[in-house]
Amino acid sequence: MFKIKKLLQKAIENLKKKNIPQPELEAQIIMANVLNCDRIHLLIDLDKEINKNQKNKFEKYVNLRMKNYPLFYIIGKKEFMGIEFIISPDVFIPRQETEFLVEEVIRLNKNRNSRILDIGTGCGNIAVSIAKFIPGADITGIDISKKSIEIARLNSKRQNVCDRVKFICDDFLRFKKNLNINKRFDFIVSNPPYVAGSEFKFLQREIFYEPRIALYAGEDGLFFYREIADFSKKYLKRNGLTIVELSYNNSEKVIDIFRNMDLRFIKTVKDYFGFERVAV
């Protein structure tokens, strides 16, 4: 048998050597996941012993993290808007800054029965969160990845909103060509891929483990904003709103794209660091 305290100490030392941020916290999160308990219960009884299988599993996960493999892929879940979402390496990991987008939809929604489209839904974190906070909304999430759609459907079932959230596996470019012109939306929302080709070499190492299809957006990083603007011009209801997440440095270019489609720019929302993170 092996004491939790000693295993954690060793893991923290190893994570520190690899410059992993918050090594103590991350080691505790990994151990809690292995033992299927929360961190509070873990910390109450650090002298508890675990078996060899649990020890091996813990050390395997710590070794993965030392290679910059994302923590949330290791534990298979990520909290977003206070909701726990199941994730896998097949989906983009939900980011805290995307909560600004969801909060803006909730704040601006005036119609209890709004029709909302989430483009590039991933694990469904945006669509499912909106459904939880706007009970009457009719939401469609679209993604090109079959595995993403499977996980999104699982998350909608876990949150009991699958009757109001429909997920479609399709290429957005094909979807926008074939959609009935009468099926317009009150909100079109998206956290689209926005990494430019020239920016890839500057990304944090752990981001390379995430699906490239969820990151890459052409050489200038603006491909999907152009497509979303074109789609919005045709499929937004009168007084409808398109709300998109921004990169830290692309707000002016994105705003120009929508203005060039004769769509009125309303505002941007800044994130915790003062970057313009959401455009309405």
Per-region residue spans from a language model:
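A short N-terminal interaction module
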Residues: M1-F58
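Mobile active-site "lid"/loop adjacent to the S-adenosyl-L-methionine
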Residues: Y194-F224
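Conserved SAM/SAH cofactor-binding pocket of Class I
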Residues: Q96-E206
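Conserved beta-strand segments of alpha/beta enzyme cores
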Residues: E84, D138, R164-K166, R264-K267
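Active-site beta-alpha loop architecture of Rossmann-like, nucleotide-cofactor-dependent enzymes
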Residues: F72, V195-S198, N249
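Conserved AdoMet
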Residues: N33-L108
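Conserved Class I SAM-dependent methyltransferase catalytic core
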Residues: E219-V280
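Short helix-capping segments at alpha-helix termini
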Residues: I20, I134-G136, K157-C162, Y235, ...
